[in-house]
Amino acid sequence: MSVTAKIIPQEIIRLKRDGKILDEQAINGFVSGLVDGNFSDSQVGAMAMAIFQQGMSIDERVNFTKAMMRSGEVLSWEGFDGPIVDKHSTGGVGDKVSFMLAAIVAACGGYVPMISGRGLGHTGGTADKLESIAGFNVQPSISEFKRIVKDVGVAIISQTDNLAPADKRLYSIRDVTATVESIPLITASILSKKLAAGLDVLVMDVKVGNGAMMNNLDDAKALAQSITSVANGAGVKTQAIITDMNQVLGTSAGNAIEMYETVKYLTGKQREPRLHKIVQALASAMLINTNLASSEKDAREKIDKVLNSGLAAEKFDRMVSALGGPKNFIEKPWDSMKKANVITEVRALQHGYIAQTDTRAIGMSVVGLGGGRTAPTQQVDHSVGFDRILPLGVQVNRGEVIARLHAKDEDSANRAIEQFNNAITYSEESPELPPVIY
């Protein structure tokens, strides 16, 4: 039953709390209240929890997404001679895919206007990672953003006040009210920003596992279905790929150290196999859906060409300098990023195979080090985190190095070492590894 409500915050909250289907007027009232302040922070938190507990129908999700999209500016890309394409990840630990992926697709002829988020819960934020680079401005004007996309082919920025401002407020409150993992809220949050960005094509990386918002495959499939249904229904060609997040992606988790792994990937110095497989799959989907590649084989050849020729690395370097960073970031990344005060090793507590990692716990350990937020206004320490993390399935001896820790002081380092060790489970037999792509 559809219920029409006056725009009184507590009445709209009550309707959803009681499991009613909100009509367009009620949804528009909530979204307007996000922007004009008619809903207080506590009321927004209560509404988020009501949606978390009661869910939303597909019609509600479509109306919610469109209302949040219309809460600000909607970008137009007239005069561009190639497809406008983006990728979005539901988030995980060590997920630096956006950086190499955007550079690869831009090098292949796509235009990638990527509007990224901050850290959310235990997951790292793309915008936070870019701010590891001295001078990098993640909040240029919209006109400057469009100019860089046209000139370079790619620009990665943080959410602006102009695009889906309703979501910007909701996103920050979800982070501190335990309402991150709601499929309707995730769907509307992602797609309001992506639809406002004026995309032709969107590729979704839906993470599944103990380091993802979606812990099990059924939930991941439900989210993928929700996003593709709402997005394709709104006129944006969208494909979702479900990828594993039962361990840290790549070999690092943090901010500056993930940017360094990105540089090593783009320059060919280090391409961790799972990370490379996911980058290839997502890049192929972006190229095929935009008709920049005619087949999977054609896409893979184009990806290899721009990586091996250095063109993708050049695109990333140009984007960094265009957005205020140094002109030679790829060549000398640590000249413009802060290193941690304490760098030490995490050693295995026993002999055996690394059978499981509590990936969420590792993400929360990075947050505890200062590399993420426990409150929306908190400052991030870009220097902290873990790198040289060994993957699942590796056999180690007691005392062998399984990761390296970057911390601001000895006390936080000791806590993080204990947390990392507690997150590792060993086995005597070689474990069965989860698939990289489902």
From Swiss-Prot:
Enzyme Commission number: 2.4.2.4
Record-linked PROSITE patterns: THYMID_PHOSPHORYLASE (PS00647)
Transmembrane residue ranges: none
Pathway: Pyrimidine metabolism; dTMP biosynthesis via salvage pathway; dTMP from thymine: step 1/2
Keyword Transferase: yes
Similarity field: Belongs to the thymidine/pyrimidine-nucleoside phosphorylase family.
Subunit structure of this chain's protein: Homodimer.
Protein purpose: The enzymes which catalyze the reversible phosphorolysis of pyrimidine nucleosides are involved in the degradation of these compounds and in their utilization as carbon and energy sources, or in the rescue of pyrimidine bases for nucleotide synthesis.
Protein name per its UniProtKB record: Thymidine phosphorylase
Species for this entry: Colwellia psychrerythraea (strain 34H / ATCC BAA-681) (Vibrio psychroerythus)
Name of the encoding gene: deoA
